[in-house]
Amino acid sequence: MPIQVLPPQLANQIAAGEVVERPASVVKELVENSLDAGATRIDIDIERGGAKLIRIRDNGCGIKKDELALALARHATSKIASLDDLEAIISLGFRGEALASISSVSRLTLTSRTAEQQEAWQAYAEGRDMDVTVKPAAHPVGTTLEVLDLFYNTPARRKFLRTEKTEFNHIDEIIRRIALARFDVTINLSHNGKIVRQYRAVPEGGQKERRLGAICGTAFLEQALAIEWQHCDLTLRGWVADPNHTTPALAEIQYCYVNGRMMRDRLINHAIRQACEDKLGADQQPAFVLYLEIDPHQVDVNVHPAKHEVRFHQSRLVHDFIYQGVLSVLQQQLETPLPLDDEPQPAPRAIPENRVAAGRNHFAEPAVREPVAPRYTPAPASGSRPAAPWPNTQPGYQKQQGEVYRQLLQTPAPMQKPKAPEPQEPALAANSQSFGRVLTIVHSDCALLERDGNISLLALPAAERWLRQAQLTPGEAPVCAQPLLIPLRLKVSGEEKSALEKAQSALAELGIDFQSDAQHVTIRAVPLPLRQQNLQILIPELIGYLAKQSVFEPGNIAQWIARNLMSEHAQWSMAQAITLLADVERLCPQLVKTPPGGLLQSVDLHPAIKALKDE
């Protein structure tokens, strides 16, 4: 047989073998198209498990008349246009194969209208060459897709369909997964004319737990522990069930999403299972609903035609990040249950027609996500900023210079109890408790200060060391420990291990948590000032220092650590210097009254002024 180009219908049917596995696959592809179109309401009508009819109606932006024929063609899409787009996919669909593949194994009709059009248009493809016919129709703004007689022209595929109930259960599961991914969209599902599911959109700032309970059940909701974990461009949010109360029914709840895309990923499941293994039996599985947000450039979703899998560029980092996030929440084991909404669900009612939606290009707009209402917010992972509510709009420190300047001119609150009420002094008198005003940065690491007409130079690295020592020195309560994203495991000698065991209580007060075995020690947590340090260098040096000591005082250890920390700033900026001085004045007020050697040096300008006047 000679090499020849396959007819369009045959080529599409081959592609359909990868994309269209069963009716649930059709529903998934079409609903994802609706979400990409910016729909806020999606109605799904199913008949006979999807074998007879699948109808998807939405109020998205619609498709222009001139693009309807292209919409049913292979490799035609509005979601990517270049290789750069393919490397950072933010839409659910992007391959441009779904509609062409579905239309090749069914009788598909596409009806759509944009806000700019006065009338709707309907398109359908038929024949060996898949010629598209377009005609006018009546339809509100949005799109309706009807898929009739799925696999009517491929009897072998139709023969492999299961019972009507089984196929609809697969569709129901797909809708449950999509409803958990998009709390802001109303989704209605009906089967054989009867409404089966109604997931109402959660208003902005509303409680997502109501939909979570409707989908996953009250049992999961009562045992759910909220996760809010962040590290650089990685964010993990969602819920994981307490492993101590996991039942076989709960173990079936395993929903994971990567950048809003529902996913079954072995790497993610392994990380969660590993975090829960100490509390789960050999035959038990964790229950979770987790949302992983990652830089689109760091994940490849173009792996499987049905987009069930992804490939992470830094899979080990992602694995350890998820493991640490889940483990940290399980270690807290808060007992307060998630808030339940006892308001009864209204009885199902008839579904009205889709309302007219705005016809703007929703796909080009950034997705607005609502904050999760967590019961617990863990400490940020290594190199991360504190986890912020969704979305993260925390301003940078540069925008707060005015506030910092104001703090520099105020008297820090006295630590001792006042003996008697005294009249408040004017703000200008507070200069006696301040280093002064930062004029400029000299030689990249010194701040030129002015106070009461006097000029002085302050060594910023020395001020930073004093600040870190104050931050590391425990007060009435131990220093807060920050769990490491990846614990540091080191080999130690017998002498070093003995010293660590003797200093364990003092190190715990400093926020350093470790676990030792025969010849190794594993550092599991460190205080916040150490998070940006190279621990593979600092910790061995600290162990060597402890091995030479006979008395282990937290203050002495804090002083040694502060003097051996590497500075985070090779060159200081004005904003960084102002922030540092504000922190030093707040935590170390004694340094303002009695500056130690090497911190502050007065600058006498009188000789220079006199020389200028003499000339």
Swiss-Prot record:
Region span, Disordered: 370-397
Source superkingdom: Bacteria
Keyword DNA repair carried by entry: yes
Gene Ontology cellular component annotations, sorted alphabetically: mismatch repair complex
GO biological process assignments: mismatch repair
Keywords associated with the record: DNA damage, DNA repair
Compositional bias annotation for Low complexity: 378-391
SMART domains associated with the record: DNA_mis_repair, MutL_C
InterPro entries in the cross-refs: DNA_mismatch_repair_CS, DNA_mismatch_repair_MutL, DNA_mismatch_S5_2-like, HATPase_C_sf, MutL/Mlh/PMS, MutL/Mlh/Pms-like, MutL_C, MutL_C_dimsub
One Pfam family cited in the UniProt record for this chain: HATPase_c_3
A GO molecular-function descriptor: ATP hydrolysis activity
Task of the protein: This protein is involved in the repair of mismatches in DNA. It is required for dam-dependent methyl-directed DNA mismatch repair. May act as a 'molecular matchmaker', a protein that promotes the formation of a stable complex between two or more DNA-binding proteins in an ATP-dependent manner without itself being part of a final effector complex.
Stated family: Belongs to the DNA mismatch repair MutL/HexB family.
Protein name stated in the entry: DNA mismatch repair protein MutL
Species whose genome carries this gene: Shigella dysenteriae serotype 1 (strain Sd197)
Gene: mutL
